[in-house]
């Protein structure tokens, strides 16, 4: 089982969204519904195992919908069951992934038929694993704040954070 989700990577304070010139043409303005926040920057999409090991990540502009990054994110993924949040709720995506051999589970909205049976608390608890990983990355490495001024610097910072985080899963004697 693998879990996918995304988090914002703002490059400036919200008051400067329309004046920002860093990463012009690459970053743009997006909305994060869980934080009720408009931000200028990127979105980092991650694929994580149940134990919290980061398998893959993709960086997109802030306005790119989560569904558009799924195929890049899961390419080469060995896990066949993928848990996601409401941002990935789509029949077309579910059908596309089924043809590739993946089973996509997303919770249903509360007003949808069968939501109480479908949204099992154990699956929801498993899905929260990735939220915990994002919190740890923010606490340990301050991943949501970047001082990178070029794409190479941004990529290097993210690679270093993922490497350092994943190395914590191995015991060195």
Residue ranges of each PLM-predicted region?
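Polybasic low-complexity intrinsically disordered regions
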Residues: 1-86, 90-103, 109, 162
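Structural motif
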Residues: 36-37, 148-158
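Hydrophobic (often cysteine-bearing) scaffold residues that line and stabilize catalytic clefts
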Residues: 66, 126, 155, 159
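Helix-centered, glycine/charged polyanion-binding patches within enzymatic domains
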Residues: 81, 86-152
């Amino acid at each position: 089982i693998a879990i996918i989700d995304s988090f914002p990577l703002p490059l400036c304070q919200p008051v400067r969204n329309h004046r920002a010139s860093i990463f012009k043409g690459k970053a743009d303005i997006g909305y994060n519904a869980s934080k009720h926040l408009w931000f200028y920057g990127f979105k980092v999409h991650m694929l994580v195992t149940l134990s919290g090991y980061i398998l893959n990540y993709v960086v997109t502009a802030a306005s790119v919908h989560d569904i558009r990054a799924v195929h890049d994110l899961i390419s080469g993924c060995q896990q066949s069951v993928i848990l996601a949040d409401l941002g990935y709720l789509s029949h077309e995506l579910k059908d596309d992934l089924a043809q590739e051999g993946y089973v996509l589970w997303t919770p249903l909205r509360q007003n949808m038929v069968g939501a109480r049976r479908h949204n099992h608390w154990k699956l929801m608890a498993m899905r929260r694993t990735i939220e915990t990983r994002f919190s740890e990355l923010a606490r340990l490495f301050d991943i949501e704040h970047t001082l990178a001024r070029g794409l190479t610097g941004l990529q290097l910072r993210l690679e270093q954070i993922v490497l350092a985080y994943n190395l914590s899963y191995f015991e060195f004697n």
